[in-house]
């Protein structure tokens, strides 16, 4: 079944869910590598000393700035979901961009992953495992290469033992697909719209029934046809509009 989709143009946290995701819900944010959700001063104030050091000492200055923007946004989002100040959260780094929140009962059992490609920052949050495959590569025009990125999202969610192959994903050309892996059960894969040269991303989760997407401003080509309907963005008042497809 194709998931329902809510797209919010605004980056304001008030326009996004203020609670942890329910089973089957996927929360997505797309940000540019610039201060959109808050000012630079506000963002740096909520970062930990280790995060500030990581941003400032990064060998690539642009990537260090992008990390600071993404981490500050993540703290603001998780603080909203947890009902706590962003700078009080204790974040634990895991593998491949995954982040856990320590000592926070309200966020127990959710998975958080942050990905980067070109100018884009994507944050995905769900209850249970979630994976993100995201990169900038001109090869993604090739269907097999695109399927490898989809496979990366699956591996990011459940590890390498799923047994799926890029060719096993060729049966569907839709941006949303449900796949059955030989060894890891059923998974949902969603291609995330990213404008710009050769950027692509796919998110994987065990079950996706509803998607809340923030930061997509209706650029042409965003959110291609899902099932038989096209996702629509919310109006100028930034009130989310839900579109059930399928």
Regions found by a protein language model. Give the residues of each.
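Core catalytic alpha/beta fold that binds nucleotide/phospho-ligands
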Residues: 1-246
């Amino acid at each position: 079944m194709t998931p329902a989709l809510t797209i919010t143009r605004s980056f304001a946290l008030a326009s996004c869910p203020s609670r942890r995701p329910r089973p089957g819900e996927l929360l997505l944010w797309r940000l540019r590598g610039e201060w959109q959700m808050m000012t630079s001063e506000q963002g740096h104030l909520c970062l930990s000393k280790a995060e500030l050091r990581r941003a400032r000492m990064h060998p690539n200055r642009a990537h260090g700035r992008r990390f600071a923007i993404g981490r500050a946004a993540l703290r603001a989002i998780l603080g909203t979901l947890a009902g706590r100040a962003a700078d009080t959260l204790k974040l634990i780094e895991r593998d491949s961009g995954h982040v856990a929140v320590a000592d926070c009962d309200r966020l127990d059992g959710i998975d958080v992953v942050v990905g980067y490609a070109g100018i884009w920052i994507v944050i995905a949050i769900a209850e249970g495992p979630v994976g993100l495959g995201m990169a900038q590569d001109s090869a993604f025009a090739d269907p097999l290469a695109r399927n490898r990125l989809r496979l990366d999202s699956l591996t990011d969610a459940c590890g390498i033992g799923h047994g799926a192959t890029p060719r096993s994903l060729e049966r569907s050309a839709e941006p949303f697909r449900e796949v059955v892996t030989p060894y890891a059960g059923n998974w949902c894969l969603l291609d995330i719209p990213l404008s710009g040269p050769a950027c692509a991303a796919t998110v994987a989760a065990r079950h996706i029934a509803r998607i809340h997407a923030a930061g997509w401003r209706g650029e042409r080509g965003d959110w291609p046809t899902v099932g038989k309907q096209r996702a629509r963005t919310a109006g100028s008042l930034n009130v989310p509009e839900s579109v059930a497809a399928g």
